[in-house]
C-alpha cells in the first residue's frame, strides 16, 4: 500500500459557471484553469499519481499539453483511471478536502462523491471547510484543495 498527497488552488474568474468536484455550481464563479479549473479533480489526480509513483498532474495534464485545454474533470479522471489500470495498480480510496467560502459543498456532497467515485472506479469522499476569513480563500478569491489517495501496487 502507498499513499499520495495532492494539492491545487485556483482563483475565481468573473465569468462562467464554477466546475468543482465533477459538478457545475451556479452559486460560484468559474475557476480559472487550463482545463475546466476543477481544483478538486486536479488534487485527486495529483494524489493518485503520487501514490502510484507516476509523477504529478503537471506531467500528465500540463499546460504544455493542448489536448487537455478545456477538458472536464471527468475526462481527466477517465484518463487517470486508464493509466493506473494499465499499470495494474488498484486505487483503494481518495479523500478530498475543499477549502473555500463558495460553493457550498454540503448541499451537493453526495452527488459530487458519486460522480467522482463512478469516474474513478473507487470510493471518493469529500469534506469542506473555510478559513474564517483568512487568506485568499477566506477573502473569496478562490479555492484550495488537498487530496489523499491510498493505492495498492502490483
Feature names for model-found ranges:
Residues 1-115:
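RNase III-family endoribonuclease catalytic core
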Residues 95, 123-125:
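Structural preference for beta-strand elements that scaffold enzyme active sites
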Residues 106-107, 133-137:
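Short active-site-adjacent structural elements
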Residues 118-122:
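Beta-rich strand-turn-strand
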Residues 126-130:
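Pyridoxal 5′-phosphate
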Residues 137-154:
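C-terminal edge-of-domain segments
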Amino acid at each position: 500500500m502507498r499513499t499520495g498527497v495532492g494539492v491545487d488552488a485556483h482563483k475565481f474568474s468573473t465569468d462562467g459557471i464554477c466546475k468543482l468536484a465533477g459538478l457545475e455550481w451556479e452559486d460560484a464563479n468559474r475557476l480559472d484553469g487550463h482545463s475546466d479549473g476543477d481544483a478538486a479533480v486536479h488534487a485527486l489526480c495529483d494524489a493518485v499519481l503520487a501514490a502510484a509513483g507516476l509523477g504529478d498532474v503537471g506531467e500528465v495534464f500540463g499546460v504544455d499539453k493542448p489536448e487537455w485545454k478545456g477538458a472536464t474533470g471527468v475526462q481527466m479522471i477517465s484518463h487517470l483511471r486508464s493509466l493506473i489500470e494499465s499499470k495494474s495498480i488498484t486505487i483503494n480510496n481518495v479523500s478530498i478536502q475543499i477549502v473555500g467560502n463558495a460553493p457550498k459543498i454540503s448541499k451537493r456532497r453526495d452527488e459530487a462523491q458519486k460522480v467522482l467515485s463512478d469516474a474513478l472506479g473507487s470510493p471518493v469522499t469529500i469534506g469542506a471547510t473555510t478559513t474564517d476569513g483568512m487568506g485568499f480563500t477566506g477573502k473569496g478569491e478562490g479555492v484550495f484543495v488537498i487530496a489523499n489517495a491510498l493505492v495498492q501496487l502490483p
